[in-house]
């Protein structure tokens, strides 16, 4: 049935009164209520909101993928203009018809490319399958087109990549393969569901730039789903703000950023860490979060003057950590991953030192090596004047009371079979510190300290949100009154407002207890807010280290400048200049066994500010 008269001129998609619900224990739970929007050809509509707001289920409803997951979808109108200019009602299409629509007319990029790509097929086979299905091409023609698509998404050595499997590619490469697959049939509408959330800032900048370039070439309508307002400012023409399943505000990107009307939109924007917001300030400060209950209330800024002079609590000298790679018929170690190479730094009581860099730079391995969670092959680790890298396992366990770890994924680091009260109690039991009643009181106090209720102790991890689970992990890390906490990407997977709350909590705890943090992150805007000092890692080595203000306001190393330039700015009028970022991946840090890498030489360029002198600018940043 033709529907062309019902679609406005220029529109490629129109949705009216979309309602989505799920059945849970005989009860209908509404996920989206009365949602209406349209999308024009060549336009980018950003749908923003926090986890649970209904963004992703809206995208799945458009793709007609919710019915299989038990979703109940009702909609007055869901019109799509196909590439052939025929207008169809999506809700009226049969399963067989939808298979032709998906990929050919409407394509989707998912958040996690590793789970979206089939691990047993090569990249070339997976892209070619979509082309053969929708374009009736032969296998040879499909492989030629697959290579052309990989070239189009700026993947270097595309012919070689065609024969590789997904696990052999980096996260940024896999996401580009997903984009190539989604665009292989030149769809009228592309839905991108959080395609850059888990990526490093430089890879994120590449993906955003790539989507914009390809959208222009193909005149595509793009629905971009995200909770990152910096990304929204970078890519969107219009914005739809969702809160608890409803659209609370919609408008042009300039209207939303410069004159937000709804309290939730204002709260969302206030929680965005703005790179440069700490300019001229020497000490970390709390995020100025806005409460939905009291939107006019502003909390006074408090400087984090917590660093204690004297001897450092942690001293690291020439730390080396390498991983063996086996190959050949005899499965011998022939090569090694040089994850950490001659890394040295100090950490003072009450200080936050941030380790920043892209995936593969060695920052997480450095943090894990400090607690001997990964093996180190050289160097010294001195805690409170005592060398700990040579301690026996028994003595190391006692030391772990004073150095605690907060992991990136709180759900994976909590036992799903234990109540959270038992999880927090476990370190106290292992070290035999408190008897039963005192331990229970300590758990209640810790839960209150991280903003939860004492009665939450009886619940299980799956009953909490991501932000609440991260608070539980912080409570567990605090149980033993540690002197040092290593936080490895502890807030990177959280919504922007939850992220601000967790950072504020960490700062409060540092003020109250004098804890030193080693904060490992790739989010430069968060690092700017929380850090006293910053160390930039590249290919396993520190290439710049110094006071946060010096590193951010006067970056000396080209790699530091590249990281800062890639951060999305939540200001639509400030357009980032076009740069050739698209084929820029880290060089390999895999070397032949026994091969030594020259350690960088750090030179002092200011008070406490040290920078490596690269042999050539090209070695650190391709222009």
UniProtKB/Swiss-Prot annotation:
Catalytically driven reaction(s): glutathione(out) + ATP + H2O = glutathione(in) + ADP + phosphate + H(+)
Ranges of residues in domain ABC transporter: 15-269, 314-564
In terms of superkingdom, the source organism counts as: Bacteria
EC code(s) of this entry: 7.4.2.10
Q: Where in the cell is it found?
A: Cell inner membrane
Alphabetical list of SUPFAM superfamilies matching this protein: P-loop containing nucleoside triphosphate hydrolases
What does the UniProt keyword field contain?
Answer: ATP-binding, Cell inner membrane, Cell membrane, Hydrolase, Membrane, Nucleotide-binding, Repeat, Translocase, Transport
UniProt entry tagged with the keyword Plastid: no
Q: What class of enzyme is it?
A: translocase
Listed binding positions for ATP are 49-56, 357-364
Q: What is its main location?
A: membrane
Q: Which GO terms describe its biological process?
A: peptide transport; transmembrane transport
- GO MF entry, a single one: ATP hydrolysis activity
The family database entries (PROSITE patterns) matched by this protein are listed as: ABC_TRANSPORTER_1, ABC_TRANSPORTER_2
Q: How does it sit in the membrane?
A: Peripheral membrane protein
Q: Name one GO cellular component term.
A: plasma membrane
Q: Which Gene3D superfamilies match?
A: P-loop containing nucleotide triphosphate hydrolases
Pfam short name (any one): ABC_tran
Give the family, as the similarity comment puts it: Belongs to the ABC transporter superfamily. Glutathione importer (TC 3.A.1.5.11) family.
Q: What does this protein do?
A: Part of the ABC transporter complex GsiABCD involved in glutathione import. Responsible for energy coupling to the transport system.
How does this polypeptide assemble, per the annotation? Answer: The complex is composed of two ATP-binding proteins (GsiA), two transmembrane proteins (GsiC and GsiD) and a solute-binding protein (GsiB).
What name does this protein carry? Glutathione import ATP-binding protein GsiA
């Amino acid at each position: 049935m033709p529907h062309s008269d019902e679609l406005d001129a220029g529109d490629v998609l129109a949705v009216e009164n979309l309602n989505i619900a799920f059945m849970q224990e005989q009860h209908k739970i509404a996920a989206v209520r009365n949602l209406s929007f349209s999308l024009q050809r060549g336009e980018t509509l950003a749908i923003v909101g926090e986890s649970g707001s209904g963004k992703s289920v809206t995208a799945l409803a458009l793709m007609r993928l919710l019915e299989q997951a038990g979703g109940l979808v009702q909609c007055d109108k869901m019109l799509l203009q196909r590439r052939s200019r025929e207008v169809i009602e999506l809700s009226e299409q049969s399963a067989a018809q939808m298979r032709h629509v998906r990929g050919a007319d409407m394509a989707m990029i998912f958040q996690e490319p590793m789970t979206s790509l089939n691990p047993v097929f090569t990249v070339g086979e997976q892209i070619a399958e979509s082309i053969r299905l929708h374009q009736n091409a032969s296998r040879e023609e499909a492989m030629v087109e697959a290579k052309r698509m990989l070239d189009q998404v700026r993947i270097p050595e595309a012919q070689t990549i065609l024969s590789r499997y997904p696990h052999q590619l980096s996260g940024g490469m896999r996401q580009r393969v997903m984009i190539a697959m989604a665009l292989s049939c030149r769809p009228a509408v592309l839905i991108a569901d959080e395609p850059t959330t888990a990526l490093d800032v430089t890879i994120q900048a590449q993906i955003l730039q790539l989507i914009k370039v390809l959208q222009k070439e193909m005149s595509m309508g793009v629905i971009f789903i995200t909770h990152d307002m910096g990304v929204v400012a970078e890519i969107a023409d219009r914005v739809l703000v969702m809160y608890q399943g409803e659209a609370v505000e919609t408008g042009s990107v300039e209207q939303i950023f410069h004159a937000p009307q709804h309290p939730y939109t204002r709260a969302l924007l206030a929680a965005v860490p703005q790179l440069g917001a700490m300019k001229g300030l020497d000490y970390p400060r709390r995020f100025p979060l806005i409460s939905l209950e009291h939107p006019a209330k502003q909390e006074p800024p408090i400087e984090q003057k917590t660093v204690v002079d004297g001897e450092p609590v942690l001293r690291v000298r020439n730390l080396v950590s390498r991983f063996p790679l086996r190959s050949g018929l005899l499965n011998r170690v022939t090569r090694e991953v040089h994850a950490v190479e001659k890394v040295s730094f100090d950490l003072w009581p009450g200080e936050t030192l941030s380790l920043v860099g892209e995936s593969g730079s060695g920052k997480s391995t450095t943090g894990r090596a400090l607690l001997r969670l990964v093996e180190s092959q050289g160097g010294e680790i001195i805690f409170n004047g005592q060398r700990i890298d040579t301690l026996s396992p028994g003595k190391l366990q006692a030391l772990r009371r004073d150095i605690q770890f907060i992991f990136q994924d709180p759900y994976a680091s909590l036992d799903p079979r234990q109540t959270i009260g038992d999880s927090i109690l476990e370190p106290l039991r292992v070290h035999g510190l408190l008897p039963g009643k005192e331990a229970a009181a300590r758990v209640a106090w810790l839960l209150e300290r991280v903003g939860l209720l004492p009665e939450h102790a009886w619940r299980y991890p799956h009953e909490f949100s991501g932000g609440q689970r991260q608070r539980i992990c912080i409570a567990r890390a605090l149980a033993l009154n540690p002197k040092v906490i290593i936080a490895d990407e502890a807030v990177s997977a959280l919504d922007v407002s939850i992220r601000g709350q967790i950072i504020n909590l960490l700062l409060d705890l540092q003020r109250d207890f004098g804890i030193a943090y080693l904060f490992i992150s790739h989010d430069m805007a968060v690092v700017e807010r929380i850090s006293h000092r910053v160390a930039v890692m590249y290919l396993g080595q520190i290439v710049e280290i110094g006071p946060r203000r010096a590193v951010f306001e006067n970056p000396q190393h080209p790699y530091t400048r590249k990281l800062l330039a890639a951060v999305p700015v939540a200001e639509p009028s400030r357009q980032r200049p076009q740069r050739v970022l698209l084929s820029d991946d880290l060089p390999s840090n895999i070397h032949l066994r026994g091969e030594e890498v020259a350690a960088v030489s750090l030179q002092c360029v200011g008070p406490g500010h040290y920078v490596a002198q690269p042999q050539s600018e090209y070695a650190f940043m391709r222009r």
